[in-house]
Design a protein with these regions (language model features):
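Non-heme Fe(II) oxygenase catalytic core, chiefly the N-lobe of the double-stranded beta-helix
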Residues: 125-162, 167, 172-175
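Short acidic-glycine loop/turn motifs at beta-strand connectors
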Residues: 9-10, 19-24, 150-152, 221-223, ...
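N-terminal non-catalytic cap/leader segment that marks the start of a structured domain
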Residues: 1-109, 113, 282
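A generic local secondary-structure boundary/capping motif
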Residues: 4, 74-77, 103-106, 130-140, ...
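Catalytic-pocket segment enriched in acidic/His residues
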Residues: 13-14, 50, 54-57, 67, ...
Length: 297
């Protein structure tokens, strides 16, 4: 199943929908039948667990009125995250190696996942503009990533059980201000500018992705291919990420994890390349979907 957060083009509050086809969305606010979650809130749906999934399957199998996708505005599927977005750095060997060439000091490949976060306010819609302010940063860079959405929460999750805690997947671009990263000598600030985490275009539930460890992912800028890889090249696989992140830290339903980016980022190119106002950034993960974001308002 593919789940969206949308609002009608004519206006109205955002609400949760279920894609019936590639071109139609069922408005869960109008289905009735006493859903076991708040149909205006994706976090509530995810927290609803198996009862919510069972109810959605009944909706998907029934005959329901739907709205044309072209008549709605898609928001980030989780538009108001309850917590920061968890991220994994240096999780593709080729990206670590390209970064090593651009770094002034030698850094050893981590023996454990390198975690950091992006502020909750970074989350942006799948087709919304990414803010650009040259007085803040002139080195805005791209990073395609597979986004993982936690379903059942947990703490100290065994690696063998980790995938049972996945609700679904989405596309993420971990947009990064490289000059700010260097200025502060850490990741958080340079990766936490408002609107710097386009997410979506929907959540694909975990049962619909046969092998999340074998998905092509790519970035295009103005139509030119910049990143092209596959999640099979993840250095730390998804179960390891979940298990290590949950050590002593309770993961909650709706938590978002960006699992790392492959090579091809702008700062490691010769000469370096960065996004400019008017550029169109396209971010795609096989089996999930495509984000298309213009740089600048």
């Amino acid at each position: 199943m593919r789940l969206v957060t949308f609002s009608p083009q004519a206006g109205g509050a955002p609400r949760v929908g279920l894609l019936r086809t590639d071109d139609e969305v069922i408005d869960l606010n109008h289905v009735g039948g006493n859903p076991p979650f708040d149909p205006a809130d994706m976090n509530s749906l995810i927290a609803g667990g198996e009862k919510a999934i069972s109810w959605l399957r009944d909706v998907a199998s029934g005959s329901r009125d739907a709205v044309a996708l072209g008549q709605v505005r898609l928001h980030a599927p989780i538009s108001n995250p309850r917590r920061n977005v968890y991220c994994v750095g240096w999780n593709y060997l080729d990206h670590f190696e390209e970064g090593a060439k651009a770094r002034p000091q030698k850094v050893d490949l981590p023996a454990h996942p390198a975690f950091f976060t992006k502020a909750a306010g970074t989350v942006n819609g799948p087709y919304d503009a990414i803010p650009f302010d040259a007085s803040v940063s002139t080195q805005i860079d791209w990073e395609v990533e597979l986004g993982l959405i936690i379903g059942p929460g947990g703490k100290n999750i065994p690696e063998a059980d980790a995938m049972k805690h996945v609700f679904g997947y989405a596309v993420i671009n971990d947009v990064s201000a490289r000059d700010i990263q260097r200025r502060h000598n850490q990741w958080f600030k340079g990766k936490s500018l408002d609107g710097s985490c386009p997410l979506g275009p929907w959540i694909v539930t975990s049962d619909a992705i046969r092998d999340p460890g074998n998905l092509r992912l790519s970035t295009r800028v103005n139509g030119a291919l910049k990143q092209d890889s596959n999640t099979r090249h993840l250095y730390f696989k998804l179960p390891r990420i979940i298990a290590e992140l949950s050590l002593g830290l309770t993961l909650e339903p709706g938590d978002i994890i960006a699992t790392g980016t492959p090579s091809g980022v702008g700062y490691a190119r010769t000469p370096p390349e960065f996004l400019k106002p008017g550029d169109v950034l396209e971010t795609e993960v096989e089996g999930i979907g495509l984000l298309r974001n213009r740089i600048g308002n």
